[in-house]
Amino acid sequence: MNVSLKWLGTLVDIKGMNPDDMAETLTVDGIPVEHVIRPGEGIKGVITGKILSVEKHPDADHLLICQLDVGEEEPVQIVTSASNVKAGQIVPCALSGAHVPAAHDNKAPGGLRHGDIKIKAGKLRGVKSAGMMCSLGELGMDANLFPALNHDGILILPEDTPVGVDIHSLYDLDDVVYEMELTANRADCFSMIGMALETGAIFRKKVTLPSISVKEEGAPIEGRASVHISEPAYCKRFCGRLLENVKIGRSPEWIEDRLRSNGIRPINNVVDAANYVMLEIGQPLHTYDYDKVAGHSLTCRHAHEGEKIVTLDGQERQLNPSDLVIADGDDKAACVAGVMGGF
């Protein structure tokens, strides 16, 4: 499990505390922090800029000359080989003196960066260039966690991104994330609220839990949808709620940032909400399309002998009779209970 200190700071008062000292104290007190990850580590002096114009290089067909507004009195000129740039776009700019990571390793804890590149002004085929515009990879950002951003060429930022701001202020690159190595006896800490309560107890800090309220309206759910438990010895509670008139779209940026801090790829507001709640309170949950659930009924049961399921990652999985599944009204397994949904 990962713990974003920005997120944690909304639940418990950790303002002014040193992240490394906090990690050491938590570890000594039985809440081991395996790694302290700084997502923006290796990025220095990279700011946002707006492309004012794009012209062809006079002596190189594969190069373009861009004039950019980076929040200074005069525009800066950057020469690039990227073909996806055009006037009006907001892009990350690493000007002379800036630093960017040399590499991004998805297999390392938190996608740790290796090496460092210092940007210098220079000339490309005789034309001055004040630095470089950056791609996702050049900023050390895991493309898998940013499905809404372009993965090829220069990173094109949302059009409402302010000009001249440090890239660290975007996508929580200025966050600090703990990669936890929690043991089975501390399952209470496998959630942000659990970590907030533990952090508050250890450091004697005030904890403020989110206020939750639900307004029920519309037709009663009775007769429209139902849930059942066929294995009460293994599933103590199974409940559901029917949500109507849902418009599927992109989640707010702050939710996407919090999911990314845990290595979870944002999908859409429905899937993201389920993943967010799981991280916040530690309770796995899954969303189903009401129109596609046979019989509008769900039952928690053990898997049948030889039963298989195709999970959301596209993999066909052989189930064991000891596995709990959620089955629809046709008795087809629709989800591996508490683990992963299926088709």
Write out the residue ranges for each language-model feature.
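Conserved mixed alpha/beta core segments that line enzyme active sites in large multi-domain catalysts
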Residues: K50-I78, V163-G164, D257, A274-F343
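Structural motif
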Residues: V76-Q77, I90-P92, A130-M132, K206, ...
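Short, solvent-exposed loop/turn segments at the edges of secondary structure
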Residues: K128, L173-D175, K236-F238, N320-P321, ...
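A short, flexible low-complexity segment enriched in Lys/Arg and Gly/Pro that occurs
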Residues: G97, D166-V176, E244-G249, E305-D323
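Glycine/proline-enriched, intrinsically flexible loops and inter-domain linkers
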Residues: L5, L11, E24, L64, ...
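A generic local secondary-structure boundary/capping motif
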Residues: G40, T80-S83, K120-L124, V165-L170, ...
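Phosphate-backbone binding interfaces of nucleic-acid-interacting proteins
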Residues: M1-A219
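Short helix/loop capping segments that flank catalytic or ligand/cofactor-binding pockets
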Residues: I78, A87-Q89, P101-H104, D142-N144, ...
